[in-house]
Amino acid sequence: MLTLTRICAVSYEVRSTFLFISVLEFAVGFLTNAFIFLVNFWDVVKRQPLSNSDCVLLCLSISRLFLHGLLFLSAIQLTHFQKLSEPLNHSYQAIIMLWIIANQANLWLAACLSLLYCSKLIRFSHTFLICLASWVSRKISQMLLGIILCSCICTVLCVWCFFSRPHFTVTTFLFMNNNTRLNWQIKDLNLFYSFLFCYLWSVPPFLLFLVSSGMLTVSLGRHMRTMKVYTRDSRDPSLEAHIKALKSLVSFFCFFVISSCAAFISVPLLILWRNKIGVMVCVGIMAACPSGHAAVLISGNATLRRAVTTILLWAQSSMKVRADHKADSRTLC
């Protein structure tokens, strides 16, 4: 199917603004996820045992760092190398494919975190579910290795699917009454096919995430009804744990849906319609979502909150020492 595309230039001001926003998003995303990684990795260096949830957060932060790096490279490609009048260059296509795979690994890790919350917080009555929850708690490291293996398999399949299809271009020119040249161009539809193929692999972890999150929501409602009947204490540790877990899961769901919608919209905008401004908006949305969820994870994790408090106290004391030193030097003068 041929799509009518108007070739329009993007101004220098728009490109500069987009690049500035991309730098800010990359800096915020890199700092938040690097903070999560360093806090958990420091425990590994000190040979302190990491909890299962901390192991998942460690892997999740690594995948987010890759996501932010790829999105920043995508922003540089859009502003400096990829032209509207030309087909997609191979480097930009490679960035898109790598982002899809990293995003899929991110979804698998979120599903793993959701299962872990279910195994810890939900009180099952059925024997099979009790055994399944115990198995999840014991096999979390194997699950993480399985996620890495699945991501590698998906990488190989996506690369094979991408490079095995023949590349073709159909280009025609149409001159309208106002002498506006319109370009009909279909180029590298195999990229779009590979995009859809990779996202099919996201269906199992997404369903797993939805089912486990739904079970956690039902457990929270049941627990709240039990509290209303038997106790009036609002500060219940189990209730607070349920709420914190659901906050992180619901926020991930919202950010993931927004990011996925932006990614789906950006593909036809770039391949068929050649609307670079629309692609820039989509890339900006996709870069903001991982940073937002990282902030939610930091606020809901006790270890990360303590690390933030320690850093803030250190910064405050350092500023106070510098201020006192300047005051003393002025007094001596």
Curated annotation (Swiss-Prot):
Membrane spanning stretches: 18-38, 56-76, 95-115, 143-163, 191-211, 252-272, 277-297
Presence of the UniProt keyword Transmembrane helix in the record: yes
Gene Ontology CC entries for this record: plasma membrane
Known glycosylation sites: N178
InterPro entries given in the database record: TAS2R, TAS2R38
Ranges facing Cytoplasmic side: 39-55, 116-142, 212-251, 298-333
Positions on the Extracellular side per record topology: 1-17, 77-94, 164-190, 273-276
Pfam families, alphabetized: TAS2R (PF05296)
Membrane topology category: Multi-pass membrane protein
Location (main, coarse): membrane
Claim: Transmembrane helix is one of the keywords in the record: yes
Keywords, in A-Z order: G-protein coupled receptor, Glycoprotein, Membrane, Receptor, Sensory transduction, Taste, Transducer, Transmembrane, Transmembrane helix
Sample GO molecular function, one term: G protein-coupled receptor activity
Further comment: Most taste cells may be activated by a limited number of bitter compounds; individual taste cells can discriminate among bitter stimuli.
Family classification: Belongs to the G-protein coupled receptor T2R family.
PANTHER family assigned: TASTE RECEPTOR TYPE 2 (PTHR11394), TASTE RECEPTOR TYPE 2 MEMBER 38 (PTHR11394:SF52)
Purpose of the protein: Receptor that may play a role in the perception of bitterness and is gustducin-linked. May play a role in sensing the chemical composition of the gastrointestinal content. The activity of this receptor may stimulate alpha gustducin, mediate PLC-beta-2 activation and lead to the gating of TRPM5.
Official protein name in the record: Taste receptor type 2 member 38
